[in-house]
Amino acid sequence: MATCWPALWAYRFYLIVLCLPIFLLPLPLIVQTKEAYCAYSIILMALLWCTEALPLAVTALFPIVLFPLMGIMDASEVCIEYFKDTNILFVGGLMVAIAVEHWNLHKRIALQVLLIIGVRPALLLLGFMLVTAFLSMWISNTATTAMMVPIGHAVLEQLQGSKKDVEGGNNNPTFELQEECPQKEVTKLDNGQPVSAPSEPRTQKTQEHHRFSQGLSLCICYSASIGGIATLTGTTPNLVLQGQVNSLFPQNGNVVNFASWFGFAFPTMIILLLLAWLWLQVLFLGVNFRKNFGFGEGEEERKQAAFQVIKTQYRLLGPMSFAEKTVTVLFVLLVVLWFTREPGFFPGWGDTVFANEKGQSMASDGTVAIFISLVMFIIPSKIPGLMQDPKKPGKLKAPPAILTWKTVNDKMPWNIVILLGGGFALAKGSEQSGLSEWLGDKLTPLQHIPPSATAVILCLLIAIFTECTSNVATTTLFLPILASMAQAICLHPLYVMLPCTLAASLAFMLPVATPPNAIVFSFGGLKVSDMARAGFLLNIIGVLAITLSINSWSIPIFKLDTFPSWAHSNTSQCLLNPSNSTVPGGL
């Protein structure tokens, strides 16, 4: 029997995949309705996503098989959901991000900002957080963290080395990056036998450095998650929301676009980032703000050491290449086109130049992203000239384009594209089967709870759930249910969908919650308890910041104070309950 458990554990994923469908079979066999069939599919996929018995993208393919066989949707209708406009926006945005990463433009931006902000302890934390958050707005959180953590550790090692030299009366003329961790300090007697140096001030300095190292590591992974919420393409849950809104409410008039999302989420990100900086500063640096800002004894020497590390890394990048300059121009052009396509407060180029009969823009944010990506495939990475092939002297060779398909194929997370499509297919199947309407009817008692309280409770639920489940899977599962609930109680759907989408990015407590946390944890120096202690209060702060945003500046942006006509599932019910159709009345 003792040898049975290791075997079961080793084959646990196979057992889960085989047993789960059988265990859930009573639901469709006893309740033979389309709603039950769809519920069976959703519960099965939710459990597989939570356990990760199959890769997330593989589970996302289940609707292609289950929905046609159960009579929920035609196969052709299901497959369309896997490559919608939101998927195109995701692919196009990632292509631009891949170009930025491929030509090291993100590293140049990071080092330049750190040189400007300075390297005093509190400012160093702020500098790393600002840079990481800004980069996470445009490229993946994982790539940003993977780049920033080594830079942070190089600075920390130089700071530690500088401390030792200052205490020992030595100078540190060289500031090269150290790849190995500094050895433990020992002193030797005349006989050559090492003994520990029980210097109390030095022990205290070592403890301070360790706490500062923990704080810097956590500030990088936390700001990567926080920064991703600021833009529509910053992290995948944001795109899941846009896709779900467009799928569930086709007549919404493109209410969630790049400009409207930025107006809502960017101020939220700034507030949360500053509060996170203050919390991490207090937790790991203490409340001696004079010392935190570098006015203590010997701080100038340490500051110069860290500054030289960053300056050396920046110098190694060399001057900006033609490719970097081109990517910068195209990146800025992309952002400008996104903002001006349909800004909302003045007619955009999409509404005026490319409008249809109804006056609506025929171009989308995905159109812009793909256009800029195509340009990157056309422009050469070097100024055209008479270049010779080094392998074949005398033969001319054209430089590669700024973006090549090999580069894109190697770095593009195609699994996320499929995962997005699976979420949209689930939402569509839930709508067509009638499951969404059934859930909405069951959730009508929530209309007696104030909307603000409902939003807070749901945010806390999502924030807890996302600690142990992929944030993409979390939003994919919950957003259709939240939309149905909002329709049933005549509440603006975005009033609950927007904050819960942001809450899915509040994965601060566990290393397994999100890849940036795992990357930082893998570098060492952190325990799970350290991350949980810092992340618990940060989760609470995040929910409060989101609650503030959804009840203030978000109301005029998305018109959250009314129940929109495009969200009516039962018009007569909403007309009979007008008190529930406005957010401020329930606050």
Curated annotation (Swiss-Prot):
Tell me the superkingdom of the source: Eukaryota
> Which CDD domains does the annotation name?
SLC13_permease
Give the UniProt tissue specificity note. Answer: Expressed in large and small intestine and in the kidney proximal tubules.
- What are the UniProt keywords, alphabetically? Cell membrane, Ion transport, Membrane, Sodium, Sodium transport, Symport, Transmembrane, Transmembrane helix, Transport
The record's Gene Ontology cellular component field reads: apical plasma membrane; plasma membrane
Query: According to Swiss-Prot or TrEMBL, what is its membrane topology?
Result: Multi-pass membrane protein
Q: Name one GO molecular function term.
A: fumarate transmembrane transporter activity
Please state where this protein is localized.
Apical cell membrane
- Region annotation (Disordered) ranges: 188-208
Q: What biological-process terms (Gene Ontology) are attached?
A: alpha-ketoglutarate transport; cellular response to lithium ion; fumarate transport; succinate transmembrane transport
Pfam families (UniProt xref): Na_sulph_symp (PF00939)
Q: What is its main location?
A: membrane
Which residue ranges run through the membrane?
13-33, 53-73, 86-106, 136-156, 264-284, 329-349, 367-387, 407-427, 445-465, 477-497, 506-526, 535-555
Instruction: Give the activity regulation note.
Output: Li(+) decreases succinate transport in the presence of Na(+), by competing at one of the three cation binding sites.
Catalytically driven reaction(s): succinate(out) + 3 Na(+)(out) = succinate(in) + 3 Na(+)(in); fumarate(out) + 3 Na(+)(out) = fumarate(in) + 3 Na(+)(in); 2-oxoglutarate(out) + 3 Na(+)(out) = 2-oxoglutarate(in) + 3 Na(+)(in)
User: PANTHER family recorded for this chain?
Assistant: SOLUTE CARRIER FAMILY 13 MEMBER, SOLUTE CARRIER FAMILY 13 MEMBER 2
The family this protein is said to belong to:
Belongs to the SLC13A/DASS transporter (TC 2.A.47) family. NADC subfamily.
* Described function: Low-affinity sodium-dicarboxylate cotransporter, that mediates the entry of citric acid cycle intermediates, such as succinate, citrate, fumarate and alpha-ketoglutarate (2-oxoglutarate) into the small intestine and renal proximal tubule. Transports the dicarboxylate into the cell with a probable stoichiometry of 3 Na(+) for 1 divalent dicarboxylate, rendering the process electrogenic. Citrate is transported in protonated form as a divalent anion, rather than the trivalent form which is normally found in blood. Has a critical role in renal dicarboxylate transport.
The molecule here is called: Solute carrier family 13 member 2
Species: Rattus norvegicus (Rat)
